């Protein structure tokens, strides 16, 4: 008799965005004429920039000629892309990385979910609340979560509330934790940490021999110079932090798939006798076993982001989305909503009016304004009573959606 992995049975009925899609489809079926504007799931609407498209076409042409064809590539990524990542994203900020400390992948969602595989099942996991669901669900699947309780949380996971009272910024755990998931700029709240605030987390991790799993997928959207773009700007972070980055939102790679993870050789985990093991080597071992690398045309396209033309074009795309964020944020404030985020991130986190639940606000928004967003409760218990809108729509739809919210809600 084949037994099921019972950890999967602890998961909520469906993934958040699958449930949203189900409800939207249900509404469309009942209202086929409705003009629905989607400001929910964080998919992009701007196309790949010309520099990226040209590089990908060139790479595809190379794959069609015997003398330039490439088969299996290195699991860790091609040196031409890794070198550009280090030279452009890290060196200008005074961060020195080795070529073997950067791992190219097909998405930061995959990496943030998979990285826990090389860490012990007995580790205590801490997540901010609200939180990107993947951090929690992947640890539930692995068996670190304990039971799902009546509060909508898992017994063995430490939740760090981000509330209006603490400015949507998590406080250090009261007890020791081993694995700390941080995402800044934050999904879903759109908030950021200063260097001083981030240093507290690095210091905590160093004191407790914890590991910070730092999701910096939205760093390219940071507008304020004093906000850190990498956790490695903080002294000592190389000893305790793994950083995840993505080209998905930065350069429109949601359908192309390319990201990278930085694992400094100094980051250690320990066995029961206290012997230290470098996570860099363990992650390499995991990747060479379970991952065949990102395709050559996609990596060539990603490298084009770092050309002079690519940088200029991607910057224009980011500015486009951040103008959308400004429109959403200012429009909601004018309409009387309490809002967070939208300054250094493409996400706007709003407080629902009149103590309305997140899902009730979702239903009202789609039925009255024909606008789709993401219920805060889907990101955790502390997200109840809040709602996320994204800046990844078209300008026309963003303006139209805010006008509907102002006049119909």
UniProtKB/Swiss-Prot annotation:
Known partners and oligomeric status: Homodimer.
Enzyme class: transferase
Entry keyword annotation includes Signal: no
Pathway note: Amino-acid biosynthesis; L-lysine biosynthesis via DAP pathway; LL-2,6-diaminopimelate from (S)-tetrahydrodipicolinate (aminotransferase route): step 1/1
Lineage per the UniProt record: Bacteria, Bacillati, Bacillota, Clostridia, Eubacteriales
SUPFAM superfamilies per the UniProt record, alphabetical: PLP-dependent transferases (SSF53383)
Record protein name field: LL-diaminopimelate aminotransferase
HAMAP family (UniProt xref): DapL_aminotrans_1
The protein's Enzyme Commission number: 2.6.1.83
UniProt similarity note: Belongs to the class-I pyridoxal-phosphate-dependent aminotransferase family. LL-diaminopimelate aminotransferase subfamily.
GO BP of this protein: lysine biosynthetic process via diaminopimelate, diaminopimelate-aminotransferase pathway
Gene name for this UniProt entry: dapL
Keyword Transmembrane (UniProt): no
InterPro entries in UniProt: Aminotransferase_I/II_large (IPR004839), DapL/ALD1 (IPR019942), PyrdxlP-dep_Trfase (IPR015424), PyrdxlP-dep_Trfase_major (IPR015421), PyrdxlP-dep_Trfase_small (IPR015422)
Binding locations of pyridoxal 5'-phosphate: 72, 108-109, 132, 187, 218, 246-248, 257, 292
TM spans (from-to): none
